[in-house]
């Protein structure tokens, strides 16, 4: 691991624990085990470190989507609907659970999510990041996919944004439940699977 990568990972851990404003560059440097002057060779200030965290986490999410063969990450746009149609309900549930675990268990992605949740009320820039990653941005991304599903006859001709809200809102709630009660993982997994099954029954054009 390079010094720059250590700075990013350590900074994210500290930000998630203490809040963005509660961590100094000097503290980050000490935790990494370098002088502050060495840290400044990679990042000129704390805002640049945050930008590095965002870029690194975005890349981690992208790589995880590719590893899990998420269709929108590995297929052409005109192949996405067909790819999802080929999945069984169980496969869709397993796929969704894998991504749920990415956002709740992966150290980098989980800390990033917690950082944005924690700091959204204190920092407008971080509030915008939270909205882009986990609220409006997520809903918009799902809406685009579901709009294509409806256009291709896979889903019922329902407003795609409403479909996205029906899909994503329960998952956001389960994120919160996991953060509060990680010991209830098996129950959360069962709820997630039930949600995916019911969602498919409600919006599939075959039903």
Question: What label would you give each PLM region?
Answer:
Residues 55-62, 67-69:
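Short, basic, alpha-helical segments at the C-terminal edge of helix-turn-helix-like DNA-binding modules
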Residues 53, 91, 95, 108-112, ...:
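Residue-level detector of well-ordered alpha-helical segments, enriched
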Residues 96-99, 113-117, 167, 171, ...:
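Short alpha-helical scaffolding segments that buttress acidic/His motifs in well-ordered protein cores
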Residues 128-132, 136, 146-197:
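Hydrophobic/aromatic-rich alpha-helical bundle segments in the mid-to-C-terminal region
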Residues 6, 14-57:
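Helix-turn-helix
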Residues 66-106, 164-167:
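Hydrophobic alpha-helical connector segments
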Residues 5, 9, 114:
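Short alpha-helical elements of helix-turn-helix
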Residues 90, 104-151:
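Amphipathic alpha-helical packing segments from all-alpha helical-bundle domains
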């Amino acid at each position: 691991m390079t010094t720059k990568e250590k700075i990013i990972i350590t900074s994210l851990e500290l930000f998630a624990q203490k809040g963005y404003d509660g961590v100094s560059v000097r503290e980050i440097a000490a935790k990494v085990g370098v002088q502050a002057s060495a840290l400044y060779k990679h990042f000129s200030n704390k805002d640049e470190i945050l930008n590095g965290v965002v870029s690194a986490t975005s890349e981690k999410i992208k790589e995880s989507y590719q590893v899990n063969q998420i269709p929108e990450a590995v297929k052409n746009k005109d192949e996405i609907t067909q790819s999802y149609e080929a999945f069984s309900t169980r496969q869709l549930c397993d796929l969704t659970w894998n991504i749920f675990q990415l956002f709740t268990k992966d150290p980098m992605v989980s800390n990033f999510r917690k950082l944005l949740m924690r700091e959204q009320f204190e920092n407008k820039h971080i509030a915008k990041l939270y909205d882009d990653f986990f609220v409006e941005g997520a809903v918009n991304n799902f809406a685009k996919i579901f709009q294509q599903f409806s256009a291709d006859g896979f889903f019922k001709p329902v407003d795609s944004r409403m479909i996205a809200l029906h899909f994503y809102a329960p998952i956001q709630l389960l994120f919160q439940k996991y953060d509060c009660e990680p010991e209830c993982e098996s129950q959360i997994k069962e709820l997630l699977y039930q949600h995916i099954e019911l969602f498919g029954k409600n919006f599939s054009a075959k039903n």
